[in-house]
Amino acid sequence: MSITAKSVYRDTGNFFRNQFITILLIALLCAFITVVLGHAFSPSDEQLSILSEGDNLAGSAGLFELVQNMTPEQQQVLLRASAASTFSGLVGNAILAGGVLLLIQLVSAGHRVSALRAIGASAPVLPKLLLLILFTTFLVQMGMMLVLVPGVLLAIVLAFAPIMLVQDKMGILSAMRSSMRLAWANLRLVAPAIIGWLVAKTLLLLFASSFAVLTPNVGAVVINTISNLISALLLIYLFRVYMLIRN
């Protein structure tokens, strides 16, 4: 049976609409966790103010030159802020992926599922998911930094890895290798969804300033929730594609 993107989009939309409240609560909870962790591990406002001190940063042409012109104390604060942002984002994304994928599994099995139950059921796979997302994020971002196309291509071919890890209980490297083969063989179904997801995430960043009317923490939760909903929609689509291909 031929799989058409249109039919998968329709199935994805139906599931997203029917489970919207649960998905929204998962997205909101993950956004809250991301913001709280980021706030807890980030430098204080007083420490962050060090980054704007001195004239040594004026005239820096790029990011690398900017970092080189910083004092050791400024570099330490920047490193801590970057690490806090990266860690909180990875934890939030791992919980989101686990929660959404377990929600799909449980609903497909005929169970009524709450957001907390879906996240709780994903607890056993969260450590592996966290490592998987760390590896894939690193590879994709390195590809984006070198040239845009390799980063996008890596995002496409690694798209099935979280699903294979959760659904088929694969190891991290096995899931990545299997995802590369399967996604490449079904590029016409995977590529448009991944590119659309990347564009949506980019547009959200561009419009982030629109949330400036809110307090910083509330604005961060709102932006992260919207971003999580976009990612949840992609996960539902990819899960549906994967199950159709496997069957």
Swiss-Prot record:
Keywords assigned: Cell inner membrane, Cell membrane, Membrane, Transmembrane, Transmembrane helix
Protein's membrane topology: Multi-pass membrane protein
Compartment list: Cell inner membrane
Transmembrane parts of this sequence: 20-40, 87-107, 119-139, 146-166, 194-214, 219-239
Record's keyword annotation contains Cell cycle: no
GO cellular component: plasma membrane
Keyword match Cell membrane: yes
Family assignment from sequence similarity: Belongs to the UPF0259 family.
HAMAP family linked to this entry: UPF0259 (MF_01067)
The protein's name: UPF0259 membrane protein KPK_3195
Native organism: Klebsiella pneumoniae (strain 342)
Source taxonomy: Bacteria, Pseudomonadati, Pseudomonadota, Gammaproteobacteria, Enterobacterales
